């Protein structure tokens, strides 16, 4: 039994859902998202509540039930509130700047890294060492933030690199002399 899959999704004001043969479109104040769901999951929209049902308790249907509900809920939250990931940079000379929709990063390499914003994603640079990635699609926001982090992930000896705000970086002790 999927406990997450059985939860009811309540639609906030201004959000509407259309289900066309398991291709679900969610419209809200921040935008519109469309996603195709598995044919075995039945999506019912009743008033301002959405429920997902599976035809039987086969292993395949159980695994997809909770995931489908979580994906649909993320779509509803995305078009009503949006998602954001905050990153911070640690290191001498590490800085970020915005050039149009492009994020230009100086992270201790011989060249600057440029990251083009994917469709639906916006970058903000509140200070030279912090980056905010925001958008309505949770998956794309997370993937973009992870890509930026991968350009210079935090190293354990000095802690230099790009990390999520609040991320704990395990530190190691350096080599000891004789």
UniProtKB/Swiss-Prot annotation:
UniProt GO molecular function: rRNA binding; structural constituent of ribosome
PROSITE patterns in alphabetical order: RIBOSOMAL_L6_1
Assigned GO CC terms: cytosolic large ribosomal subunit
GO biological process: cytoplasmic translation
Keyword terms, alphabetized: Ribonucleoprotein, Ribosomal protein, RNA-binding, rRNA-binding
Record family assignment: Belongs to the universal ribosomal protein uL6 family.
Subunit structure: Part of the 50S ribosomal subunit.
HAMAP family registered for this protein in UniProt: Ribosomal_uL6_B
Function: This protein binds to the 23S rRNA, and is important in its secondary structure. It is located near the subunit interface in the base of the L7/L12 stalk, and near the tRNA binding site of the peptidyltransferase center.
Protein name: Large ribosomal subunit protein uL6
Species this protein is from: Streptococcus thermophilus (strain ATCC BAA-250 / LMG 18311)
Lineage: Bacteria, Bacillati, Bacillota, Bacilli, Lactobacillales
């Amino acid at each position: 039994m999927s406990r997450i899959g059985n939860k009811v999704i309540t639609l906030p004001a201004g959000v509407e859902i259309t289900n066309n043969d398991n291709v679900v479109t969610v419209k809200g104040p921040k935008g519109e998202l469309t996603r195709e769901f598995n044919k075995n999951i039945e999506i019912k929209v009743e008033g301002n509540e959405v429920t997902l049902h599976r035809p039987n308790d086969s292993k395949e249907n159980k695994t997809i039930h909770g995931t489908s509900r979580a994906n649909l809920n993320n779509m509803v939250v995305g078009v009503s509130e949006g998602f954001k990931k905050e990153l911070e940079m640690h290191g001498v000379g590490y800085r970020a700047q915005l050039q149009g929709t492009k994020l230009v990063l100086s992270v201790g390499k011989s060249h600057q890294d440029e990251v083009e914003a994917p469709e639906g994603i916006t970058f903000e640079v509140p200070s030279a060492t912090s980056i905010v990635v925001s958008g309505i699609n949770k998956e794309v926001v997370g993937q973009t933030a992870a890509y930026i982090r991968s350009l210079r992930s935090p190293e354990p000896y000095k802690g230099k690199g790009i990390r999520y705000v609040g991320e704990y970086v395990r530190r190691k002790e350096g080599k000891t002399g004789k």
